A protein has these predicted regions:
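N-terminal secretory signal peptides that target proteins for export/translocation
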Residues: 1-16
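Bacterial N-terminal signal peptides
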Residues: 20-31
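N-terminal secretory/targeting leader peptides
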Residues: 37-127, 135, 139, 143-345
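Low-complexity, intrinsically disordered segments with a bias for serine/threonine
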Residues: 16-21, 35
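Short linear Ser/Thr-Pro motifs
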Residues: 31-32, 67
Length: 345
């Protein structure tokens, strides 16, 4: 595996530079580089100078031109404003105007959105798409009531476990020192049900922790794992997909509402045109990242059918446990209803 470091770097450079979608599907445009009295300050964990940011900058230039620079964005990239919870806090205090988030960050504003990421609830990304489309309008209204504009949905990708020892059973997972993203209530509940003592920390701390051995296992999409260089410190990944990561960009409503009707129409049209392209790009890059890891020496361990079934039963128990804590019974019922609709097609 270590003989493939050159390949790792080459692959992680091209793929990692395009991982913006892991954080939010980021449908807002990046900074146009031109100052404006109404310039929006948007924070993201995505790296500056990446190929993905270059694409978004082209779009930002287009928006700036169409609005005569009345609408511009300034991105604070690479986590310089902190982890997602830090950005949320700064938004509430007026330090930031918006952020590009995974569902972990989004749930700091509206916890119920995590109902879309329940463990083992979807059998495919297409199934998730169908349910998400049916429910996204509800989440947009909930965010608006709390003073935020939730934009179009983005993808993080299929979530797998990555480790330095093969994980074929829940017992194997219990033996590992597994990362837990801060106090993520959903993953924490799943880990508790399995009997895993997660090691809580923010995303920027994961790679150093893998380096020192503080943790020896983590979870995420292939694209995130390559982009963040985690895969250079692990040897195995599970074939099982436990969930499909959801993301989006959020803007403070008071900032959004300052736009004129004309500019609002232009911005909405631009965001809409980029939404599908970004989701498509993230899905393609997740597949490329998966292949790149395998070429670099990471071994994919086929998850036994009995283990998948065990995780499914554990997941179903967690769905019920989190009712009233993250989302309502009605929210869960709607997810299951729309899932059944899709499966009946």
């Amino acid at each position: 595996m270590h003989n493939h470091l050159a390949l790792r770097h080459r692959n992680s450079t091209s793929l990692g530079s395009r991982f913006l979608g892991i954080l939010a599907g980021i449908l807002i445009l990046a900074s146009s580089g031109q100052a404006s009295a109404d310039e929006w300050r948007i924070a993201t964990l995505a790296p500056d100078g990446s190929a993905w940011m270059k694409i978004l900058n082209k779009g930002a230039t287009d928006v700036a031109a169409k609005t005569s620079n009345r609408v511009t964005f300034k991105y604070y990239t690479g986590g310089v404003q902190g982890d997602e919870k830090d950005v949320i806090r700064k938004m509430k205090m007026g330090g930031m105007d918006g952020g590009a988030f995974t569902s972990v960050g989004l749930s700091q504003i509206e916890p119920s959105i995590r109902v879309l990421e329940l463990p083992m609830i979807f059998a495919s990304v297409e199934e998730m798409d169908y349910v998400r489309h049916k429910m996204w309008g509800t989440f947009m209204k909930r965010f608006a009531k709390k003073g935020y504009i939730l934009l179009a949905p983005g993808d993080v990708g299929p979530i797998h476990f990555y480790s330095n020892a093969p994980i074929k059973t829940q017992a194997d997972l219990r033996k590992a020192k597994v990362w837990l993203w801060g106090e993520d209530a959903l993953v924490k509940a799943m880990f508790k049900k399995i009997g895993v003592n997660g090691v809580p920390m923010g995303v920027p701390n994961v790679l150093p922790a893998l380096n020192t051995g503080r943790i020896n296992a983590c979870y995420g999409s292939p694209l995130a794992t390559v982009a963040l260089q985690w895969y250079t410190k692990i040897r195995y990944m599970t074939s099982m997909t436990s969930s499909y990561g959801v993301s989006s960009t959020v803007i403070k409503k008071e900032i959004w509402d300052k736009m004129s009707p004309e500019d609002l129409s232009l911005v909405k049209k631009s965001l809409s045109s980029h939404a599908k392209k970004l989701r498509s790009a993230v899905r393609k890059d997740n597949k490329r990242a998966h292949k790149a890891m395998l070429r670099a020496g990471v071994k994919e361990i086929e998850t036994p059918a009995e283990t998948v079934e065990t995780f499914r039963k554990t997941g179903e128990a967690v769905w019920t446990e989190l009712v009233g804590e993250l989302y309502s019974q009605k929210d869960l019922d709607r997810v299951l209803k729309y899932r059944a609709e899709y499966r009946a097609k």
